[in-house]
Swiss-Prot record:
Protein name: T-box protein 2
Subcellular location per the Swiss-Prot or TrEMBL entry: Nucleus
Comp. bias intervals (Low complexity): 302-317
GO MF entry, a single one: DNA-binding transcription factor activity, RNA polymerase II-specific
Tissues showing expression: Expressed in body wall muscles and a subset of pharyngeal neurons. Expressed in head neurons and occassionally tail neurons. Not expressed in the pharynx.
Keywords: Developmental protein, DNA-binding, Nucleus, Repressor, Transcription, Transcription regulation, Ubl conjugation
Biased composition (Basic and acidic residues): 394-404
Annotated spans, Disordered: 238-324, 384-423
Higher taxonomy: Eukaryota, Metazoa, Ecdysozoa, Nematoda, Chromadorea
Organism expressing this protein natively: Caenorhabditis elegans
Chief localisation class: nucleus
GO term, biological process aspect, one: cell fate specification
Modification after translation: Sumoylated.
Amino acid sequence: MAFNPFALGRPDLLLPFMGAGVGGPGAGGPPPNLFFSMLQAGFPPGPVGSPPEDDGVTDDPKVELDERELWQQFSQCGTEMVITKSGRRIFPAYRVKISGLDKKSQYFVMMDLVPADEHRYKFNNSRWMIAGKADPEMPKTLYIHPDSPSTGEHWMSKGANFHKLKLTNNISDKHGYTILNSMHKYQPRLHVVRCADRHNLMYSTFRTFVFRETEFIAVTAYQNEKVTELKIENNPFAKGFRDAGAGKREKKRQLHRMNGDATQSPPGKTASLPTHSPHPSESNSEDDEPTLKKCKPEPSQTPTTSSLSTSTTPTLSAHHPLRSPQFCIPPPIDMMYQNMPMDLLAHWQMATLFPQFSMALNSPAAAASLLSKHLAKASSECKVEATSEDSEEAEKPEVKKEQKSVTPPKKGGFDVLDLLSKP
């Protein structure tokens, strides 16, 4: 294990020697500037003075990359990793097996991504070319494995999986993702630090491991079709892209068949889509994979003859907007409200048929004047009826007197009065 130069009296004297890679299997490549990564991540430097005391622990960490053959296949084509504002995980997954640790000692396992060179790239004529000088880099986040710190026995039995490491191009990121520049080449580095406390990381012994086949170029969309094909073939979440030709047609038939079963299935049962069983520690929506395109359903041909359906479940049809009912004239209001004044009923009916006349009923003054007119009209009608009755009673005696003075006509020139008048 190597000592932290910040723990020495003259750390600048060790800077020329930091260009040499750390020995051991899988090591080498860029200098292990773990200290500067810690400073950028916000770790305070350790105390300057004498080197830390030897704790007497003897270990020789060794790291082996899982799926190394797959990484080599990608490296031959030029590995690309998609970066997004919301963060994207890397594929192939960066998983390692660790050995040579002290079983009882505590260890931190960390990773950072550093620029592989000082160039900017472009994809032209099916190959990557240097397009100019690299853009300034944002401060990199030192990703600490969630299981840290753990005993050496834990790391040697479980290994380390960095599937939760996310890449982004959002310079305003607040989630702790690793910020990268598009069209730039980066190299992942793995650090094994023997330390039990996070605050002592800056002056603890460590070892850095670099695997050249994990080098990649950050992109916002895949440039090389070969890389896309490799991701589709090996990513467990991209199985939907593996069908081609007749396979696509068969997939559409299965999709329509499932849709038909969903419409004809009883209410208690629902049609479920086939599910895949990916790696338990990986997520479907966040892995570095092509976006699954939604296949459009084929237009169904309308049959010339109608057929009766035996299914009791109503089929889903297109949504039709609600329409207002046709205009109809309501019945006369005096038929329903016989005891109300006719003028009020007339105004009410006019207000219901024509809203512009509703102001007469909504205004209190108009309603009061309408009521006063109604009362005045009712009182005048009562007075007219009373005067008519008095005039009829006054005319009746005169009619009787006239009837007394009228003599009935004689029958045959002889009347009973004539007999009584004679002696």
